[in-house]
Structure formats: structure tokens, C-alpha cells
From Swiss-Prot:
GO terms for molecular function: 1-deoxy-D-xylulose-5-phosphate synthase activity; magnesium ion binding; thiamine pyrophosphate binding. One of its GO terms (cellular component) is cytosol. Pathway: Metabolic intermediate biosynthesis; 1-deoxy-D-xylulose 5-phosphate biosynthesis; 1-deoxy-D-xylulose 5-phosphate from D-glyceraldehyde 3-phosphate and pyruvate: step 1/1. Coiled coil: none annotated. It holds the Pfam family DXP_synthase_N. Homodimer. The lineage of its organism: Bacteria, Bacillati, Bacillota, Clostridia, Natranaerobiales. The gene is dxs. Thiamine diphosphate binds at H74, G115, H116, S117, G147, A148, N175, Y286, E368. This is 1-deoxy-D-xylulose-5-phosphate synthase. PANTHER family: 1-D-DEOXYXYLULOSE 5-PHOSPHATE SYNTHASE-RELATED, 1-DEOXY-D-XYLULOSE-5-PHOSPHATE SYNTHASE, CHLOROPLASTIC. It comes from Natranaerobius thermophilus (strain ATCC BAA-1301 / DSM 18059 / JW/NM-WN-LF). Its cofactor is Mg(2+); thiamine diphosphate.
């Protein structure tokens, strides 16, 4: 029997489908998702939870005309499948393939690019106001998860939307609650009343008639208001949105397609902003994902029958795990150490810390700005707060780093995970800007370890410095080196010469140091013995060592996994320029001034001629060119 999904190429193909067809299609979409993501990896559980919701949205609205903004965006896979990208789905998050997030450059159905949390309502409000100014009539929707709704930006946008009374719909996809039968039935009934225009006309007529009754009409009206208020406050969550100027509808069963369509159709007819509160089950339809939704939030390839990842040979621990284990070990000896994360406990490696030191662990939710200033307050009172955060999300709190931490010299430690190329998440999550935006801040010390053992030592060093410190380290497995037992601090503001050579010097930081060593090994086969220097500190830079290297070598190359503008190579160039040695710096090996796409690190490096063999070719071509000119 031919599957319905084989006939669905755009959302227009849904328009003629019956409810029975849509429910069957929902099953097929889940099968397709599970099969595909078991091979490519991706955000499985969130997308299994929004199958019916996405079908209802595409049935009621016209994604080509209407504007749908997905927040955070990782739950947009069904949207992609329904908008002509089904055949490309095997390339999801692969180099040169489909993005895991909405991307306007990828499809005209993607109204707005997302990837960072809590931005959808702001973007949707901007589009709604633009529509009004232009005199057009498209619908505007923001689909936001309950996690993203915890971000302050979402409430800033709702406050503004309520003030503007713009016609727009916010769909709150809440997968943290479950609706019992009685509550669900009552909710459905109340939702139908509140979304049916006839209800509002009757309510207004009753209020008008009551007010006209002599003597007792006013009292009766007050009684009605008290009853109404009592009922409203039974639905406290809705009240928050109502007070912000939204019409609140819900909770709605997010897996009931007819009910979703009815509510969305009624929401379209309302004036002003509407919030539709939808309850969904994360991982729905796949037992392992329902049982362990966090595990399948973002997953690698897995076996469909069991949900287990393919067994791999034992490898080095991840940088995140080494960080988590190390900071826990330090905390056992130092009671002033506390850990803070912004809704990324597992991702940053703090799960065990939270279990062992619950009173010293703080998950502030998706609130990076608050996390940083909260840490500054703790530091002000004598604690050693360690903020574990991804590089891409630290950007969101730049003002707080400057104003609340560094300007006051508060000793906050920033443990910056996912620095550099991050893989499948792509442009929105690349950690390629932190060296540039951090090194310009006074009072801040910036370090980058060459391997997981050096990360241990840097953490121990940071805890013993009464200054703000940032340590950036990459995603994924470490280098497999032996970890330290005593974790002796590293010498302050000093790099290390790993190999002593002549003529050519390679100076780098972080993840690129092992790459430098690989290049050095290959150059040695060509008869060239380069010096390899691990700078360790981006700020303050070990200028004395770098100047000494510059005076002894003819060709200097810098290596970093950061954008070229304002990064480590720029720092070295500035140092050399001050002393008339800028001509010695031949090339800065780094990422260009553009947004770097998703894909495996090795493929991304090759795309930008930063793979080991390509770097060697650049160095050899320069040296051979010089020899030819001299000859």
C-alpha cells in the first residue's frame, strides 16, 4: 500500500486530506523521522512531539504566504519535510546538507532563521508590524517551546506585543505538562468557549443587559466579575499572558488534530495577540524517546529496536566530562566553589556536580544575562562562581561580562564549552567569536588549553586567581592524554615551547595546538624543523616569549579556531607590530569573516584550507617560493 507521505511534496498537498488521513500521515511522519534520524542523528524527541501540531499549522495556515517563526528551531523537522525537503532529509546536519534549524537561504518556507532561544516572538511581532505598515494581510505565528519561554527576551517581546495589540498568534508548545481526562475535557470546553466569537458576543450582550437593570444591575455585574475573576485565577498560567495583553487559549491537546485546527482557525479571527497553549509529549510514538526524552533531545545515530547508540571503542573522555569531573574535585576541597549553568546542566558536564553539591549548583534556565550577573553577586560575597556555558550563548551576556563582572573585577570563572567548530548545529552555534569579543575587555584573563589535561590545570589556576577568568575549550573528545592527579597550576601568563626548531615558528592556542604538532611532524619529513609554541594565554599575551621567537625565526604562523577579525592571530600581529616585527608574521590560520556552515570539523577545515595537509602546502609553497626568488 502506497504511503500518504509519498504524495506530500508541499504543504498545499495537505489541504484535501481528511482528519483520518492526517492521523495516518502523522504515524508515517514519525516512522520517517525515526528511520532517518537513526542514521544521521539530530533532534528526535522534540520533533516527535510536534507532528500533529505542525500538521495542523500547515493545514490551517499557508506557510508560503503566512509567516511561521520556530523557536528554538530544532523542532522544525516536520515543517521541513512538508515543504519540499523530504528527499534531502538524509543529509540533515551533514556538510553541504540540510540545516537542523530554519534557514531562509534554504527554503522560502522558512520565514526567519533561528537557533538561539526566545527570539521568535520579537521576530514575529516585527513581521506583524511590518505587515500592518505595508497594508498586507498575512498571518504571523511564533511557535515557542516552554523552555524557550523562560528566556527574558520572550517576555520583553510579549510585553511589547500586548502594548501594540498586533494581530499575531503565539503557540506555546508545552511538553512538560500532561493533561488528565477531566482537566483535558474542561480545558477543551473552556477553550472552545473562549475562541468562539459567539461566546464573546453573548458575554458582551449579557454585560450590557445587566448594567441596564435598575438598582441591582451593578451589583449583579460585580458578582459576575468576581465569578469570572475566580475562574480566571484558577488558570494562573493563562493569567500571566492575559495581563500582558494576550488572549489566552488553552491548554489544548497538542496531539488532537481536529481540536488544534478548530482552535487555530478561531485564533486567526481574533483581534490583538493570541497565545495558544498546547500540551505535547516529547518523544511521542517512540518508546525509548518517551522514556528518555532528554537522551533523545539531541542524539547521534542509534539502533531503532533498542534506542541504543552503536558501540564504539573506548576513546578519550570529552572536554565537557573532564571539566565536570575536575570542577567537582576542586569543589570537594574548596567550599567557595559554586557552579552555574543556563539550562545546560548535562551538556556542560555538570550533572554529577549538581548531584554531589545540590546547594552549590544553580541552573538559572535560559537566562544567560541573569546567570552572569548572578555569578558576579556571588563573587562579590566571597564565592568562586564557575559559569559553564557554550561559547555561542555567552554572546548573549556581553554587557553583563563587561559591566557586572570585569568592570568590578569580580572573580567569576567562565568555563566556555563548544568553542570553535561545533559540527551539525552550524552557523547559529559555532563558537568562533569568543576570543575576539573577550580579549577587548579589561581585567579579563583568557586561556585556551591544548588538551584535556591542560584544561584541568587551567581550572585549578583560575580558582586560585582573584580575577575574572575565561577558559575556552572545544566540543567533543579530548586528545587522549593522561590526566593529572594533582593538577598543579600553570605559570601565570606564560606559554610553553613544545618543540624547539629554526626558521619556521608556529604559535597557536587551544584545539589547534595538536593540529600544529601534526603539521610539524609532516614538515619534519620535508627536512624542516619548526618551533611549536603553545601560547596558553590569549590575554594577557606572553609577549616576551613571542618577541623572542620572532627575533630567532624568519617565518611565523599563528593557529586558532576563531574568526580572523580580532582573534589570537590579530593579537600576535599587534604585538609584533609594536616592535617593528610585523613582517615576520606570514599567515594567520583561522576561520574567515563569514558564517561557517554545519558539518564535520574535518570537512569544515578542508573547506577553508585549514586541514593539516593544506596548511603544510601553504607553508612549503612559501618557503620554496622564497628559495626560488633567492636562487
Amino acid at each position: 500500500m502506497t504511503k500518504l507521505l509519498s504524495y506530500i511534496n508541499t504543504s498545499e498537498d495537505l489541504k484535501h486530506l481528511s482528519t483520518e488521513d492526517l492521523n495516518k500521515l502523522a504515524e508515517e511522519l514519525r516512522e520517517f523521522l525515526i528511520s532517518s534520524i537513526s542514521i544521521t542523528g539530530g533532534h528526535l524527541a522534540p520533533n516527535l512531539g510536534v507532528v500533529e501540531l505542525t500538521l495542523a499549522i500547515h493545514k490551517v495556515f499557508s506557510p508560503i504566504q503566512d509567516k511561521i517563526v520556530w523557536d528554538v528551531g530544532h523542532q522544525s523537522y516536520i515543517h521541513k519535510i512538508l515543504t519540499g525537503r523530504k528527499e534531502q532529509f538524509s543529509t540533515l546536519r551533514q556538510f553541504g546538507g540540510l540545516s537542523g534549524f530554519p534557514k531562509p537561504e534554504e527554503s522560502r518556507y522558512d520565514a526567519f532563521g533561528t537557533g538561539h532561544s526566545s527570539t521568535s516572538i520579537s521576530a514575529a511581532l516585527g513581521m506583524a508590524k511590518a505587515r500592518d505598515l505595508q497594508g498586507s494581510n498575512e498571518e504571523v505565528l511564533a511557535v515557542i517551546g516552554d523552555g524557550a519561554m523562560t528566556g527574558g527576551m520572550a517576555f520583553e517581546a510579549m510585553n511589547h506585543a500586548g502594548h501594540e495589540q498586533a494581530n499575531m498568534t503565539v503557540i506555546l508548545n508545552d511538553n512538560e505538562m500532561s493533561i488528565g481526562t477531566n482537566v483535558g475535557a474542561l480545558s477543551s470546553y473552556l477553550s472552545r468557549l473562549r475562541t468562539d466569537p459567539k461566546y464573546h458576543r453573548i458575554k458582551e450582550d449579557v454585560e450590557f443587559l445587566l448594567k441596564r437593570i435598575p438598582a441591582i444591575g451593578g451589583k449583579m455585574m460585580k458578582s459576575v466579575e468576581r465569578v469570572k475573576d475566580s475562574m480566571k485565577y484558577l488558570m494562573v498560567s493563562g493569567m500571566l499572558f492575559e495581563e500582558l495583553g494576550f488572549t489566552y487559549i488553552g491548554p489544548i491537546d497538542g496531539h488532537n488534530i481536529p481540536q488544534l485546527m478548530e482552535v487555530l482557525n478561531n485564533a486567526k479571527d481574533k483581534n490583538g495577540p493570541v497565545l495558544v497553549h498546547v500540551i505535547t509529549k516529547k518523544g511521542k510514538g517512540y518508546e525509548p524517546a518517551e522514556k528518555f526524552p532528554d537522551k533523545f533531545h539531541g542524539t547521534g545515530p542509534f539502533e531503532i529496536e533498542t534506542g541504543n547508540a552503536p558501540k564504539k571503542a573506548e576513546t578519550a573522555p570529552s572536554y565537557s566530562k573532564v571539566f565536570g569531573d575536575t570542577i567537582s574535585e576542586i569543589a570537594r576541597k574548596n567550599e567557595s566553589v559554586v557552579a552555574i549553568t543556563a539550562a545546560m546542566k548535562d551538556g556542560t558536564g555538570l550533572t554529577n556536580f549538581a548531584r554531589e553539591f545540590p546547594e552549590r549548583f544553580f541552573d538559572v534556565g535560559i537566562a544567560e544575562q541573569h546567570a552572569i550577573t548572578f555569578a558576579a553577586g556571588l563573587a562579590r560575597k566571597g564565592f568562586k562562581p564557575v559559569v559553564a556555558i557554550y561559547s555561542t550563548f555567552l554572546q548573549r551576556a556581553y554587557d553583563q561580562i563587561i559591566h557586572d563582572v570585569c568592570m568590578q573585577d569580580n572573580p567569576v570563572i567562565f568555563a566556555i564549552d563548544r568553542a570553535g567548530i561545533v559540527g551539525g548545529d552550524g552557523e547559529t552555534h559555532q563558537g568562533l567569536y569568543d576570543l575576539s569579543y573577550l580579549r577587548s575587555i579589561p581585567n579579563l584573563i583568557v586561556m585556551a588549553p591544548k588538551d584535556e589535561a591542560e584544561l584541568q590545570r587551567m581550572l585549578n589556576t583560575a580558582v586560585n586567581i582573584n580575577k575574572p577568568v575565561a577558559i575556552r575549550y572545544p566540543r567533543g573528545k579530548g586528545e587522549g592524554v593522561t590526566l593529572w592527579e594533582n593538577m598543579t597550576p600553570i605559570p601565570l601568563y606564560k606559554g610553553e615551547t613544545i618543540r624547539e626548531g629554526s626558521q619556521v615558528a608556529m604559535i597557536g592556542v587551544g584545539k589547534m595546538v595538536p593540529d600544529m604538532l601534526e603539521v610539524a611532524d609532516m614538515l619534519k619529513k620535508e627536512g624542516i624543523e619548526p618551533t611549536v609554541f603553545n601560547a596558553r594565554f590569549v590575554k594577557p599575551l606572553d609577549e616576551s616569549s613571542i618577541l623572542e621567537i620572532a627575533q630567532k625565526h624568519e617565518y611565523i604562523y599563528t593557529f586558532e579556531e576563531n574568526t580572523e577579525l580580532g582573534g589570537f592571530g590579530s593579537q600576535v600581529l599587534e604585538c609584533l607590530s609594536k616592535h617593528g616585527l610585523a613582517h615576520k608574521l606570514i599567515d594567520r590560520f583561522c576561520l574567515p569573516d563569514e558564517y561557517i556552515p554545519h558539518g564535520d570539523r574535518s570537512k569544515v577545515l578542508s573547506q577553508y584550507s585549514l586541514h593539516s595537509q593544506e596548511l603544510i602546502n601553504k607553508i612549503l609553497n612559501r618557503l620554496r617560493g622564497e628559495q626560488i626568488e633567492q636562487g
